[in-house]
Amino acid sequence: MEIRDAGESDLPGLLTIYNDVIATSTAIYSYVPVTLEDRTQWWRARVAMGYPVMVATDASGVLGFSTFGDFRTWPGYRFTVEHSVHVRSDTRGRGVGKELVKALFPRAAALEKHVMIAGVDAANQASIRFHEQLGFERAGHLREVGHKFDRWLDLVFLQRWIGPR
């Protein structure tokens, strides 16, 4: 497995993973699949802002991807980012997501970020444990702030310090 910066040629693989997550899970609180054009614009915007889009690949193609972006747009939040990581369904549990998130830490540090946030559906205990194993701590629980699959969803925020405290 190789972890590297995603290129435009990786976007069809990212798109497949992203749309599968939208259709089958509450990891993304969205209902509508995105197009390759949408993903391309998203990727170009991340790159233009200096934010990484990391990809894990092997001989079978794209295994997963990770990225981070601004947590909030106000200047006082400029040292805080929120990350996302999504892995192809047939590769979960093999450490792909862990390596993708770990690859973000030095990139955030290089941009002088102080805290990384993870927003996780509260019912996804596996993802909460995953983040805790990577050094994230629970920071808040927001009740019924999302809605998908005809039910209300709670959101858990976790945070990890990137730089010195």
Per-segment meaning from a language model:
Residues 5, 32-90, 101-102, 107, ...:
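Acetyl-CoA-dependent GNAT
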Residues 15-42:
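Conserved GNAT-fold acetyl-CoA-binding loop/helix
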Residues 108-120:
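Conserved GNAT acetyl-CoA-binding A-motif
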Residues 67-70, 75, 117-120, 132, ...:
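Conserved catalytic-core motifs of GNAT/GCN5-like acyltransferases
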Residues 95, 124, 150:
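Conserved G/P- and acidic residue-centered "switch" motifs that form tight phosphate/ATP-binding loops
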Residues 93-106, 129-133:
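Conserved acetyl-CoA-binding loop-helix of GNAT-fold acetyltransferases
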Residues 2-14:
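A short beta-loop-alpha structural element at the N-terminal edge
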